[in-house]
Amino acid sequence: MEEPESQPRERRPGARLLILGPGAEGVRLDLFLAAELDLSRSQARRLLERGAVSLDGRPLAPGDKGRPLEAQGELRVEAFVAPADQRIPQPGEAEAPPSVLAEGPGWLALAKPPGMPVHPLEEGEKGTLLGHVSALRPEVHGVGEGGLRSGVVHRLDVETSGVILVATEDAQWDRLRGAFREHRVAKRYRALVEGDVQWPGDRLELELPLRVARHKPAFVRVASSEEAARGRSRVIEQTMQKLETLPGASLVEIEPRTGFLHQIRASLAHLGHPVLGDLRYGGSRRGGAHRHMLHAAEVAFEEVRAAAEDPDDFGSVLARLRSAESDV
């Protein structure tokens, strides 16, 4: 988990600062870079070949690619700046733009449609949420991490729909990133899950040690007691409430207090209730779920507040289940 920085650091366009914690211990450098930066292993190794990676201020070489990391330290990745017309995320030509839910000085809240990436992974990629934001608010360019991640405060999986925050000023980016890092942002998700959830009082307070078991494609599982004891996991916390019992499924609400890769999807699968449509974690196509039925319904931090209605596909699956017209 990243810790708040004690003093402001120089921000360079495209530079990434990665704080190493317990979850990084023993992980190969190239695998860690690939997972954290959404790269392939070959792309991560090319960063090393170009001298773009340093650890605690010491440049790393290509021969360090298999080096196991420790549970502390700072990795800095210097991105290579492309021509300006390529660095700006481009909106898609055919996609409907995500709707603006709320906005204030230096920030926007948008409703991310399912299937739309938050930001591009390479120059020239179109159809991302940030591409639409850059067309709507050009001042986002260079904010925060800059480059292809300009203004991005947090992320949602590509298939997950719902509220996403983007900063259009550096001061707001610092403030909001700090709030997410310190778990001061209230988040509420809705999910359609397999089976009839049986929790005492239809409510469950959950703490689980999770770890990334595979990076490409990412897969998260509950850590063994030995892995947890060695610090190779991260304890996640969330509150879950069953809202409705459906034929072969349940509608649940999740309020995560921590933020970890696939936290909600992996924890629900561990409990025997994978998200409908989430084939990676054991979910089925029940109700015609063509993607994982997980929706970020609300985000709130001080005056920054926004809520998003269920998208059409989520509502359609819910309606089919309610009328017992499931495909399964």
Model regions: which residues?
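RNA pseudouridine synthases
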Residues: 1-328
